[in-house]
């Protein structure tokens, strides 16, 4: 796989190679999600195995450590890589487990902290709601000539909020939907509203 690195078509070529391998092992993709595979119990693996891949990082889920170890061994025979053992962070999300309750949930505290630092919001005072109830964002607040600095910063903030909404913060979805209406012509009012969501 080393020759794939650096080529513009590398991710696609790697995905096709991984997909062919997983399908040869009895896996199939889940619906329209082409980077998540599931293998039903049976044969050399007596329980369901789920694999999620992001470029060359794989997250493997199954019930028993024995089955997972066997699958990891088989996978690492085919693809050169390392076994990072228990996952703590994946795609900017930390996995928090309660072994006694047999539960797990995702948080993005680290990602959120990086976003706050990137936009100099680390010392901001928290607010009770992401958007002020009296704020009405409007096209009337759009400038006739967009300041490139405001435009770039606004798009960056809204992009970061989008990732939070999609992963762990659906409570920010309304704010995100309102802010995303003004990606082409944000003004100072829109930028202030975006900063408030980060607070």
Residue positions per predicted region:
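Long, low-complexity, charge-biased intrinsically disordered regions
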Residues: 1-199
């Amino acid at each position: 796989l080393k020759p794939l690195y650096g080529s513009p078509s590398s991710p696609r070529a790697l995905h096709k190679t991984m997909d062919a391998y997983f399908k040869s092992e009895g896996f199939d993709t889940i619906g329209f999600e082409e980077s998540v595979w599931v293998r039903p119990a049976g044969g050399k693996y007596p329980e369901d195995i789920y694999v999620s891949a992001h470029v060359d990082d794989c997250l493997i889920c199954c019930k028993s450590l024995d089955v997972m170890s066997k699958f990891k061994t088989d996978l690492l025979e085919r693809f050169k890589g390392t076994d990072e053992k228990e996952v703590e962070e994946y795609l900017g999300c930390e996995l928090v487990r309660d072994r006694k309750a047999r539960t797990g949930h995702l948080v993005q505290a680290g990602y959120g902290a990086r976003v706050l630092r990137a936009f100099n919001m680390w010392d901001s005072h928290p607010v009770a709601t992401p958007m002020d109830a009296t704020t009405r964002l409007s096209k009337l607040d759009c400038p006739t000539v967009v300041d490139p600095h405001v435009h770039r910063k606004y798009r960056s903030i809204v992009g970061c909020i989008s990732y939070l909404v999609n992963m762990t913060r659906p409570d920010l979805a309304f704010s995100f939907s309102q802010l995303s209406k003004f990606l082409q012509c944000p003004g100072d009012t829109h930028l202030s509203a975006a900063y408030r969501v980060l607070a």
